[in-house]
Amino acid sequence: MIDGPIKVFLMPHSHDDVGWLKTVDDYFYGADQSTQWAGVQYTIDTVVSELANDPTYKFSIVETAFLYRWWNNANQTQRDLIKRHVKSGQIEFINAGWCMSDEANPYYEDIIDQMTIGFRWIKDTFGVVPTIGWHIDPFGHQATNAALFSQFGFNAWFFARIDQQDKSVRMANKGLEMIWHPTQYSGIDNYIFTHVNYYHYSPPPGFCFDNNCRDEPIRDDPTLDNYNLVAKSEKLVEYFKNQSLHYRSSNLFHTLGEDFHYANARMWYKNVDKLLNYINARPELNVTINYATPGEYLKAINQESNVYPTKYDDFFPYSDCDHCYWTGYFTSRTSLKGFIRDMGRYVTSVRTHLGLLKVAGSSDYIKANTKETEEALWEAEMALGILQHHDAVAGTAKQKVTNNYILTGCKALAILNKHYNEVRKEQIKNDISETVATINLGTIWNGTAADWGISAVLATNKSVLVNLYNPGPKGTYTIRLKVEEQELNIISSAGTTVAGDLICSNTQDTKDCDVLFNLAFEETSTSYVKLVPVKSGGSAKITKLKSITITESTRDFNLSSTASLKYTRSLQKFDLTTSNGNLSFTVGYNYYESYQSDGQKSGAYIFRPANDTILTPKKYSDIKTVHYAEGEVNTIIVLEGDKTYTRMYFSKLAKYVDQNGFEMETLISPINISDRIGKEIVLNLATTLQNNKTFYTDSNGLEEQKRVVDYRPTWPLVQFEPASGNYYPVNSHISIIDVNTKQRVSVLVDRSQGGTVLRDGSLEIMIQRRTTMDDSRGVGEPLDENGISQKVRHFVVIGDGNRAVQKANDQRIITCWANTASATFAKHPAPKPALPVQDTVKLYLRPFADDSYLLRLMNFDTSKSVNRQLIADYRQHPCWLDHH
């Protein structure tokens, strides 16, 4: 126990999920109260009013998405009052992103963006900059978040959920506060003071005074038989003295609130006032308690000279009981995860494109519609901010809320595309002197030819203009468009014929085909081609699928001068030879049966396999037929299973970014649970590499974490779940390295998924899951998405090229198409970069209506510094860069 007096910093707060059991709108307005009693507008109303009654009252506000709505509905008196509380220090904004984002699933770009819009609005509205991170509810914590929070300028961050075994050790060693110094391969020295809450993010047990709490109120009239002030005060003092056994400071921090509390703030402050007045008037108790904010607590402990332990790794995976690993949500609602990731990369690219056009003064549409264009970006950014919430991208909200999340994103995209399409039409006219009435976005990469609609135009013997914007680095890329089978010429804007393939690799829909061709791009540039229907001899070579029979021993494919492929049918084994080395591998699809007996069930949060499949998942999809097509641009292998349909694309371009690997596209049929057994589907890439139980996963797509099976760096692990206890979030890639040859193999993902390497050489990624039971973590329903077929993409890379593939995947070509009256180009523009940026640098440019810009640069190659002046044009918009 701490010698001397104990000072307790009691923090009033409300944890307000930006969607979970109810939609964001319902949570704000207090609708659908039968599902959950919550109304955030009432919380802010009553807190702002109550704080005016006593200058010692404090409150911390976290989720800017709700505060923004409240502010827009508030009258001037309310606005003035909350500003007064902020200025006096009674209200502190902590975290202050648009939401409290998940940590396992968001991409680092989307984390930064949702924090940026929150920070900017808080700064513009209240003139303050948040200094405290607050992540009390995410289900595990990434090292990248610690690094980013340090770079955001946060002095500390607070959270509640760490593994039960880890917390037991830290409580015994007084290690619940630490300096987190995440290992950064970039060499950047980031560290941040980290506090783990003593009792979740709740009030002390027995001291909850909210509308929905059942604890006794404080009765302070000694003439009453049920007078309890003294007993309750002594109980609270004893509680904090016990807490002091587990921290190094005589200053203690504790939360006072829970989910959607303080809709009646008077109940809280009136009851707690009685306790504080009684305890603080009695120095013999050796405890003083005051309302506080996290910033005040941090200031107090900074006056001391305590030494804190250092943390270098991360806090994954998280478990709260022996068989309760929260690793299912790494994959839950994979379609939602894919939508959010696609939307994030798309909005990032469109925003930068609009910024480059504006700063160059090359768009009359943007000049005339500056305010409207910025509002469209703002709508998209707010929607994306909501989607980063720890029950949104995590896939742990109710189904009706998930549907609303998707609707929110779709509405925002529709607003953005309304303006972006006009800009693209304008650019087409400026670049090639063609006027198009309607432009169509070809962003449905997982759609069919019928979804795209190009063939409906080609069928009328009319040509199609394709507008291609490259938001990324200079290079040659393979373009893939969805069409039906027919003879086509591909004409470049230079007037030359482009060689390509037209391959119908969908045996289930013979009209669903791909036209593939290679095209060279400058960085941040636009290119054009036309698809012209011809009677015969088109430049897009029609290549038919052929079958590899079970009796055929092997099939060899010559991919390029540096790469070849051999497939052994009887073993279903591939041997890929590249300039980065050779790789022998098999592809399989297995499944774990969900645990559904007594005890912890598998559900939206928890992945717990049934006992008989813990280490031996069952085969999910039998590969019945193998097809192939050898085109000019790609060789395609098709693995047709009874529940999966896989297309593997091997590039034949020697300098293509994917040359030292391949792309794999898997269509997963709806999971059948007619037997009422949940199923959790995994992709297994089995290689011959010996990785000695060690593998690597990225951290939010930014850094990399070393993982060792059945091992934790900071405590002696007792493993109760050998499968789920070794699962980790994969946002960008999972890799293994052979201990003898040092060969590296990585699998890159197109959305967040869970992954592991339970057996040497076998990379396992969970790609879909469906359960029949709830896992008792609050959502109150099983993860039962009915009838969903899902297409996912993976990129397998040999060697160290995963950064290049990741960058290309982040900055995908944005494809638009339109009807055109001519089969030729009247003008022949040479592609030129909107801005010359190094190929190791990723550019983010956000334009604002006041003619200001937010510039952010990500340097993927830390061995090279970047020092460049970006000159917009003669209108003088310099943006200076010195980032490395």
Predicted feature descriptions by range:
Residues D17-G39, V62-N72, N95-I112, G127-G140, ...:
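The substrate-binding groove and active-site-proximal loops of carbohydrate-active enzymes
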Residues G4-K7, N53-F59, K87-E92, T125-T131, ...:
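Loop/turn elements at helix/coil->beta-strand transitions in domains of secreted/extracellular proteins
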Residues S150-H254, E258, Y278-N290, P294-G295:
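Active-site-adjacent pocket scaffolds in enzyme catalytic domains
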Residues M1-P5, L51, K270-I289, G295-H884:
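Terminal accessory/anchoring regions of large secretory-pathway or extracellular enzymes
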Residues M1-D113, I122, F209, Y346-T352:
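N-terminal catalytic cores of secreted or lumenal carbohydrate-active enzymes
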Residues E109-T144, Q151, E238-F253:
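CE4/NodB-like, metal-dependent polysaccharide N-deacetylase domain
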Residues H13, G118, F149, T255, ...:
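Conserved, mostly hydrophobic/aromatic
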Residues T43-V48, L81-V86, I111-I122, L229-H246, ...:
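Structured alpha-helical segments in the cores of large, soluble enzyme domains
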